[in-house]
């Protein structure tokens, strides 16, 4: 899990640098503030045998961090909410990440 978490963090840092460059600001404008931040690698780790079908493990929530990243899940249910409060299922292709 440490290697996977490290790769996900590197992806976030790279995306933040790319965003800064694209906005015409210093390359480290975001990453300098991300250093030492409260980064959390939090696999749900839920025991699906203990709960009924349809149980929600992580409902609608607000992330407090600058970026959120997800890998492909082994179970269905990852959704995002559009600005007009429409729920949309997320399908992450193999080998890709959702940022």
Language-model-detected regions and their locations in the chain:
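Peripheral, non-catalytic segments flanking oxidoreductase cores
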Residues: 1-99
